[in-house]
């Protein structure tokens, strides 16, 4: 019976395989095999014995079911694993788990899961960056209303809005690449991090194992990998989830009936918005992913708590981390994928954007007129007061600001009717938006090559 929504509703199959019970088991077998391989490289284990261990260190031979049977008696998962391996290896079983402690296996296997997760997350993020770059380029010069405090501000372009998202995504990619060597790490220095059980060659043994597995080698550990590494990983997941939810929240707001400037694609032939309101076209994918992003961020708190281990370690982190790392990873991937889907199928209504600007009766061009007055020789504060008074008069009378400006002595004396008309064209007050879009797109595309 499926219980967790990840089982039947959210997350991709690849992530579920990484963090599944079988995925964990498979990687722990791989770590145990790598340990014996390293001993073989250092002359402590024969080629023949290693060959036998390598042969049985696969889930089809040392099955998860057999390990579970033994664990029911031992009440210790890694001891059950090593017993099952030794059972299958016969005389070669003597060298299995030699010099290791349980968390050498557990944390190194988790390191493999994190490494594999990062590969998938990076792939999804690069796809999202590509989709967003295309959107920014397409809408580079689409003029729309900028809003601050939920109120009409001054014109921007939709391309600039998207470029802001795009550059943030690029920073997230940089953060991931910078942090991966600190996250994809194992450890193999035994019960308290001294390497005493491995002897004088302990550090070389650890180096051989971890480089063989494709993981980074830490300098100093206790019985476990430092949980600051997991904090950094889950913090990155949470950060990316924030980026995605911010985008999706904007889509949801722009799709409001009274704004209607952009929104999710909708299959009018098959899709249903409401069981009773037949006209509805709801931004359900954005809402869905926004909810999942909040769950991702919620895993920050237990991840921080899991770093507070006693002395060289305790076990209070173990049960919690079975949830935090797996669920945060899978859900973040889902959020990124859904955000890419929303932006791929996003509709943008440029005419509606211009209509919404026009609905403000020219008020959003007050800044433009003020700046032109300053350029004409009137002080900034005086220019501001002139436009403030004109704006409030226009609001009070329900007039167009351009009409009030035309009869305001200081403005009428400074500009002709044609010059004033040009000032009230929103496209003439978008600054260097196009340049910013172009550079953001170029940098983003270079980052994902």
Task: Name each region found by the language model.
Residues 288, 295-380, 386:
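Long, amphipathic alpha-helical stalk/connector segments used for oligomerization, subunit docking
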Residues 1-189, 195, 203-208, 217, ...:
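A helix-coil-helix interface module used to build multimeric assemblies
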Residues 226-263, 270-329:
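A conserved active-site cap/scaffold subdomain adjacent to cofactor or substrate pockets
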